[in-house]
Amino acid sequence: MDLLHKNMKHLWFFLLLVAAPRWVLSQVQLQQWGAGLLKPSETLSLTCAVYGGSFSGYYWSWIRQPPGKGLEWIGEINHSGSTNYNPSLKSRVTISVDTSKNQFSLKLSSVTAADTAVYYCAR
């Protein structure tokens, strides 16, 4: 086993969250939370809560930005649970909704270093 593969076995990486996790979109505020440090092959879980506006009538999205790269759309969900996913991530992504709490969640399975990014929830 070469040194690179040996080091990859023990690789930890950061899935960065927004430094200021609550921000305002019009009168709607979104607050997200979740694990920021994972080992390869683990599952990333993030949740976003919507405050101060209507939850129904919109699609709620997850977007990410890898270091030094542009934004990448992950997927979206509406209040009734209808989803759309980025085809390149679809096999590993699940987005769910909890209308009783005005929250929606992202799960990304089998993460690798290529999934290192700033993850955003958005309307």
From Swiss-Prot:
Residues 122-123 are annotated as: Complementarity-determining-3. InterPro entries: Ig-like_dom, Ig-like_dom_sf, Ig-like_fold, Ig_V-set, IgHV. Glycans are attached at N78. It is found in: Secreted; Cell membrane. Residues 52-59 are annotated as: Complementarity-determining-1. Gene3D superfamilies: Immunoglobulins. One of its GO terms (cellular component) is plasma membrane. Residues 1-26 form the signal peptide. PROSITE patterns: IG_LIKE. The keyword Cell wall biogenesis/degradation does not apply. Disulfide bonds join C48-C121. Residues 26-123 are annotated as: V region. Residues 84-121 are annotated as: Framework-3. It comes from the Eukaryota. GO terms for biological process: immune response; immunoglobulin mediated immune response. Residues 60-76 are annotated as: Framework-2. Residues 27-123 form the Ig-like domain. Residues 27-51 are annotated as: Framework-1. Immunoglobulins are composed of two identical heavy chains and two identical light chains; disulfide-linked. PANTHER family: IMMUNOGLOBULIN HEAVY CHAIN. V region of the variable domain of immunoglobulin heavy chains that participates in the antigen recognition. Immunoglobulins, also known as antibodies, are membrane-bound or secreted glycoproteins produced by B lymphocytes. In the recognition phase of humoral immunity, the membrane-bound immunoglobulins serve as receptors which, upon binding of a specific antigen, trigger the clonal expansion and differentiation of B lymphocytes into immunoglobulins-secreting plasma cells. This is Immunoglobulin heavy variable 4-34.
